[in-house]
UniProtKB/Swiss-Prot annotation:
It comes from the Eukaryota. It is found in: Secreted. Its main location: secreted. Residues 1-23 form the signal peptide. This is Protein Turandot Z. Belongs to the Turandot family. Keywords: Immunity, Innate immunity, Secreted, Signal. The lineage of its organism: Eukaryota, Metazoa, Ecdysozoa, Arthropoda, Hexapoda. It comes from Drosophila pseudoobscura pseudoobscura (Fruit fly). A humoral factor that may play a role in stress tolerance.
Length: 151
């Protein structure tokens, strides 16, 4: 009886291990990048922010594989830090309460024209960063895939 139980556990483990787990994370990242690129004009600001944050996550995953000090990576790192400071989120939602409430109250006194210009600037910044990141990732992911095939 114990052999039967042992065999069933081994079979269950094998079934779990051979399930739909991707063996090549670079292919998964390439697929996610293609999904992001398939929608160049997001429907709304939230989708643009979400896509940019996903591109940043992909960048952080792949940029760590290069030697430090490349100018392209340094520029992207600086742009990402600036973007993340301007778009602070917790679990994908904007921060609420605290100092931000004071800032929001002060923002109520700002003319609508200035708010609209700031919003457009933020969207433009996000789009530029998104485009830079996706171009970098296309080259980076393709390069890693070519290196793997050579070895």
């Amino acid at each position: 009886m114990s052999r039967l139980i042992h065999l069933s556990f081994v079979l269950a483990l094998l079934a779990c291990l051979t399930g739909p787990i991707s063996a090549n994370p670079i292919d998964d990242d390439r697929e996610r990048l293609n999904q992001l690129l398939s929608n160049p004009e997001p429907a709304d600001d939230a989708e643009l922010l979400r896509n940019t944050q996903e591109a940043i996550a992909l960048y952080k995953k792949h940029a760590s594989r290069t030697l430090p000090g490349h100018q392209v990576e340094l520029d992207l790192d600086r742009d990402i830090r600036a973007f993340e400071t301007e778009h602070l989120t917790v679990d994908g939602l904007p921060i609420q309460g605290g100092v931000w409430d004071l800032i929001k109250r002060g923002a109520d006194k700002v003319p609508d024209e200035v708010k609209d210009q700031a919003k457009e600037l933020a969207k433009t910044t996000a789009k530029v960063l998104f485009n830079k990141l996706t171009e970098y990732l296309k080259k980076k992911i393709s390069g890693e895939d070519a290196e793997k095939k050579d070895t």
